[in-house]
């Protein structure tokens, strides 16, 4: 049982989608309690087709966070392109709290000028009713001139601005995900790739004839640690995503797996079986100095760091079934963290250190759950039968994970409050082991 669990977890826990498949979002959970907002289509001041539907990108970003419920275009009472064109009453009557308006103009040489405003509907309605000249209802206003190739990135930037102004929290829409793509029958079936968080702008970092597993981002977002079988055994490498340089970190006898970076970027928590059963170790990336953390007769696996860099959480079956435990690196004191559900595994800690996200087993089905670190209360976020490999956005608002959708492995998103769920179906092959990057700017 434990070996089956271990290899299912450390082996190839995850799933999902191709960059093109990210275009197709299937909404599987509602956001009725989210905040109503509207992103009006940006006015196109140029010839030919609009180069990028910025409003659609922003709308999708905000919807995926689970905190906002964008108004459908067909329900919009008007399509203003500036705050001065907004008739606030009909927006307010639909409960819309804020409206994003903007325009795109071609300025030549493949560059574009983009203007946008974030407008508070209630404040705007009060200002117009009282006849004042104040524009205090404009929460943010920006203008930028950018190359056409950067237009989608700028749309994510708008999403970050809107998200932060309305929630007080930093947006995570300009982040990336790393994953392993598998295309059976290809010359190099296994590929390590990165893309924008929504699957666009995909880039291949490594191609291999042998399995690749468990990518993990360094805290500065410049490197990936991962497991490779290119030499007919599991080994852990670190690769720079910009210059492609890589170094071998761990190549001991037996299993070398499940690397996770420490918050300071100097160490990796890893799993080794060089002395028998798989145990947790910490290795210094520069010196390769190795420190053993656990030493038991059962399998300890899937380490993850607490934000303080002094504590690890990990999966262990020492209590009879897989559960989450913590260990203090200085004292060695270990304690069990999870008690609900039939089993719990594959945990990571949210950036604020207040929650754990994990795979929980409920009535034989594997689902994504979040547990409060202080109270121990658990919230099951998904209702599928085989959800795996959750990875949390750097602002803690969203989780990317693997699931089965219509009989195929697919990548999925769920907000950390469970209010929004979406599946990104794959059209060919499969994607495993997604990992969400830290903030990149």
Swiss-Prot record:
GO BP annotations listed: cell division; protein import
Subcellular locations according to the entry: Periplasm
CC annotations in GO: periplasmic space
Signal peptide: 1-21
Keyword list, A-Z: Cell cycle, Cell division, Periplasm, Signal
Pfam families: PD40, TolB_N
Keyword Transmembrane helix: no
Function: Part of the Tol-Pal system, which plays a role in outer membrane invagination during cell division and is important for maintaining outer membrane integrity.
NCBIfam families according to UniProt: propeller_TolB (TIGR02800)
Protein family per UniProt: Belongs to the TolB family.
Assembly behavior: The Tol-Pal system is composed of five core proteins: the inner membrane proteins TolA, TolQ and TolR, the periplasmic protein TolB and the outer membrane protein Pal. They form a network linking the inner and outer membranes and the peptidoglycan layer.
PANTHER family: PROTEIN TOLB (PTHR36842:SF1), PROTEIN TOLB HOMOLOG (PTHR36842)
Designated name of the protein: Tol-Pal system protein TolB
Taxonomic path: Bacteria, Pseudomonadati, Pseudomonadota, Gammaproteobacteria, Aeromonadales
């Amino acid at each position: 049982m434990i070996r089956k669990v271990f290899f299912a977890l450390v082996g190839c826990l995850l799933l999902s989608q191709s960059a093109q498949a990210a275009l197709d979002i299937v909404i599987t959970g509602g956001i009725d309690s989210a905040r109503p907002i509207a992103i009006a289509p940006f006015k196109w001041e140029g010839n030919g087709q609009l180069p990028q539907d910025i409003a659609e990108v922003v709308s999708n970003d905000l919807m995926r966070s689970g905190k906002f419920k964008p108004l459908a275009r067909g329900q919009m009472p008007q399509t203003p392109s500036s705050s001065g064109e907004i008739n606030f009453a009909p927006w307010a009557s639909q409960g819309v709290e804020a409206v994003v308006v903007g325009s795109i103009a071609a300025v030549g040489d493949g560059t574009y000028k983009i203007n946008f405003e974030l407008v508070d509907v209630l404040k705007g309605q009060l200002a117009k009713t009282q006849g004042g000249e104040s524009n205090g209802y404009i929460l943010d206003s920006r203008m930028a001139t950018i190359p056409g190739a950067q237009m989608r990135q700028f749309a994510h930037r708008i999403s970050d601005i809107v998200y932060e102004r309305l929630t007080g929290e930093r947006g995570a829409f300009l982040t990336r995900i790393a994953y392993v793509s598998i295309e059976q029958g290809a010359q190099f079936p296994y590929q390590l790739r990165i893309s924008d968080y929504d699957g666009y702008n995909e880039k291949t970092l490594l191609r291999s004839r042998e399995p690749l597993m468990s990518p993990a981002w360094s805290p500065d977002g410049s490197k990936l640690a991962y497991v490779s079988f290119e030499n007919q055994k599991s080994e852990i490498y670190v690769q720079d995503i910009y210059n492609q340089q890589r170094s071998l970190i761990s190549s001991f006898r037996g299993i070398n797996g499940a690397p996770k970076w420490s918050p300071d970027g100097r160490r990796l928590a890893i799993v080794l079986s060089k002395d028998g059963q798989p145990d947790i170790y910490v290795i210094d990336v520069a010196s390769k100095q190795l420190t053993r953390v656990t030493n038991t007769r059962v399998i300890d696996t899937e380490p993850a760091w607490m934000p303080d860099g002094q504590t690890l959480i990990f999966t262990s079956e020492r209590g009879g079934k897989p559960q989450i435990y913590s260990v203090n690196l200085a004292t060695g004191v270990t304690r069990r963290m999870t008690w609900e559900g039939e089993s719990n595994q594959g945990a990571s800690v949210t950036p604020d250190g207040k929650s754990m996200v994990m795979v929980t087993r409920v009535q034989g089905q594997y689902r994504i759950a979040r547990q409060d670190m202080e109270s121990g209360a658990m919230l099951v976020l998904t209702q599928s039968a085989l959800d795996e490999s959750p990875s949390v956005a750097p602002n803690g608002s969203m989780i990317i994970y693997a699931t089965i959708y219509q009989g195929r492995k697919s990548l999925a998103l769920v907000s950390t409050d469970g209010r929004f769920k979406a599946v990104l179906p794959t059209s060919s092959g499969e994607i495993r082991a997604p990992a969400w990057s830290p903030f990149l700017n």
